[in-house]
Curated annotation (Swiss-Prot):
Subcellular location: Mitochondrion matrix; Mitochondrion matrix, Mitochondrion nucleoid
Highest taxon of source: Eukaryota
Keywords from the UniProt entry: Disease variant, Mitochondrion, Mitochondrion nucleoid, Primary mitochondrial disease, Transcription, Transcription regulation, Transit peptide
Consequence of substituting I159K: In COXPD58; likely pathogenic; decreased DNA polymerase processivity factor activity
Protein's UniProt keywords contain Endoplasmic reticulum: no
Residue span of the annotated presequence: 1-35
Annotated organism of origin: Homo sapiens
InterPro entries to which the protein is assigned, alphabetical: RNaseH-like_sf, RNaseH_sf, RuvA_2-like, TEFM
Name this protein carries in UniProt: Transcription elongation factor, mitochondrial
Cellular compartments per GO CC: mitochondrial matrix; mitochondrial nucleoid; mitochondrion; ribonucleoprotein complex
Disease: Combined oxidative phosphorylation deficiency 58: An autosomal recessive mitochondrial disease manifesting in the first 5 years of life and characterized by a wide range of clinical presentations. Clinical features include neonatal lactic acidosis, epileptic encephalopathy, developmental delay and impaired intellectual development with non-specific brain abnormalities, or mitochondrial myopathy with a treatable neuromuscular transmission defect.
C-alpha cells in the first residue's frame, strides 16, 4: 500500500490507499467528514458555497470557498493523475484528460478561476466539480439507500436521482430481430409519438457494420429529441449457443444506439441513453409467469380504450392521434408486434418506477 499526504492550513493528514479507491479520493473524504477545527477561522459550509446557479462576479470562486478549501481543491487538480481524477464522477471522460493536458501545457493551477480556462469547464460546472472534490460521496454511502439499490437494478448505467426527477420527456425504444418500435412520452404520460419500423435488412447474411449504421441512422432521424432514450435490456443467456446470432444482433443494435443517441457525452460525460430491465417492467405490470414474460397486448389495448372512456386514464393519447394509434394497433393484431406494445409499457414503467416513485 502507498500513502498520500494532504497539506491543508498548516496541518497534516495522512490516509492510506484501499484496494478500490485512490488515496486522493479517501483523503478528501476524510477532509470533508473530519471534526470541525477548534481554530477561530470559520470554514464556509457546503450549504453556503453550493449555489451552482449564482451569477459569475469577479473572483466569484474565491468568494465561494475558504482559503483552506481552495488549497485542498488545487492540491487535487495539480497532483492527481487522469485515473485519480476520474474517481470523481464529474471529472470522468474528457474533463480529466483536459485538466492534465492544461497542467502540462501551462503549469499548475494557481487559483480556482484558472480552471475555467480548461475546455468543458464553465462557471456552474466548475462550482460543481469543486464541491464534489471537497466532499465526494463514497460508494458505501450510496449503497445505504434502498432507493439507489432499486434504481441500479432497474436502470444501467447509474443515473443521479436529480436528473431522473427533472426529466420532461423520454423516448422508449424496443427492438427485436425484425423490427424496432419507440414511444415518446412526456412526464404527464401523454403519448407524443408512437411508431414502429420493420423495413430493415438486418440479420440477413453478414453482420455488416455499415448496414447497421445506415439502417439505424435512418430510424433515429425520425425520432424527436428527448431527455433520455430508454432501451429494453433483455436477459438472454450467453450459455445457449443457438442464441448467439440474436445476442450479437442485440449487442450491435445497443452499441449503435448508445453511440448515435449519446450526442453530447464526449463533451459533458452525461449519459442520455439508458437500458431498462425487461423483467422489471413485466413485474410492474404483472406480466410475469415464473421467469417468462407474457404479452402486453391486452394491457395496451385497455390503455387505448381507457384514454377515451376515463376522465383520468393511466396514459393519455391526444384526441387528434387516438384514431391513428388505434388503427395502428388493430393492424398488428394478427402479427402480435410485441415491440410496439413493449415500447409503450416500458415508457410508462420508467416514469412510474424511476421518476415518480423509485420503489416498486
Amino acid at each position: 500500500m502507498s500513502g498520500s499526504v494532504l497539506f491543508t492550513a498548516g496541518e497534516r493528514w495522512r490516509c492510506f490507499l484501499t484496494p478500490s479507491r485512490s488515496s486522493l479520493y479517501w483523503a478528501l473524504h476524510n477532509f470533508c467528514c473530519r471534526k470541525k477545527s477548534t481554530t477561530p477561522k470559520k470554514i464556509t459550509p457546503n450549504v453556503t458555497f453550493c449555489d451552482e446557479n449564482a451569477k459569475e462576479p469577479e473572483n466569484a470562486l474565491d468568494k465561494l470557498f475558504s482559503s483552506e478549501q481552495q488549497a485542498s481543491i488545487l492540491h487535487v487538480l495539480n497532483t492527481a493523475s487522469t485515473k485519480e481524477l476520474e474517481a470523481f464522477r464529474l471529472l470522468r471522460g474528457r474533463r480529466s484528460i483536459n485538466i492534465v493536458e492544461h497542467r502540462e501545457n501551462f503549469g499548475p493551477f494557481q487559483n480556482l478561476e484558472s480552471l475555467m480556462n480548461v475546455p468543458l469547464f464553465k462557471y456552474k460546472s466548475t462550482v460543481q466539480v469543486c464541491n464534489s472534490i471537497l466532499c465526494p460521496k463514497t460508494g458505501r454511502e450510496k449503497r445505504k439507500s434502498p432507493e439507489n439499490r432499486f434504481l441500479r437494478k432497474l436502470l444501467k448505467p447509474d443515473i443521479e436521482r436529480e436528473r431522473l426527477k427533472a426529466v420532461n420527456s423520454i423516448i422508449s425504444i424496443v427492438f427485436g430481430t425484425r423490427r424496432i418500435a419507440w414511444a415518446h412520452l412526456d412526464r404527464k404520460l401523454t403519448v407524443l409519438d408512437w411508431q414502429q419500423s420493420d423495413r430493415w435488412s438486418l440479420m440477413r447474411g453478414i453482420y455488416s457494420s455499415s448496414v447497421y449504421l445506415e439502417e439505424i441512422s435512418s430510424i433515429i432521424s425520425k425520432m424527436p429529441k428527448a431527455d433520455f432514450y430508454v432501451l429494453e435490456k433483455t436477459g438472454l443467456s450467453i450459455q445457449n449457443s443457438s442464441l448467439f446470432p440474436i445476442l450479437l444482433h442485440f449487442h450491435i443494435m445497443e452499441a449503435m444506439l448508445y453511440a448515435l443517441l449519446n450526442k453530447t457525452f464526449a463533451q459533458d460525460g452525461q449519459h442520455q441513453v439508458l437500458s431498462m430491465n425487461r423483467n422489471a417492467v413485466g413485474k410492474h405490470f404483472e406480466l410475469m409467469i415464473g421467469d417468462s414474460r407474457t404479452s402486453g397486448k391486452e394491457l395496451v389495448k385497455q390503455f387505448l380504450f381507457d384514454s377515451i372512456l376515463k376522465a383520468d386514464p393511466r396514459v393519455f393519447f391526444p384526441s387528434d392521434k387516438i384514431v391513428h394509434y388505434r388503427q395502428m394497433f388493430l393492424s398488428t393484431e394478427l402479427q402480435r408486434v410485441e415491440e410496439l406494445y413493449d415500447s409503450l409499457l416500458q415508457a410508462i414503467a420508467f416514469y412510474e418506477l424511476a421518476v415518480f416513485d423509485s420503489q416498486p
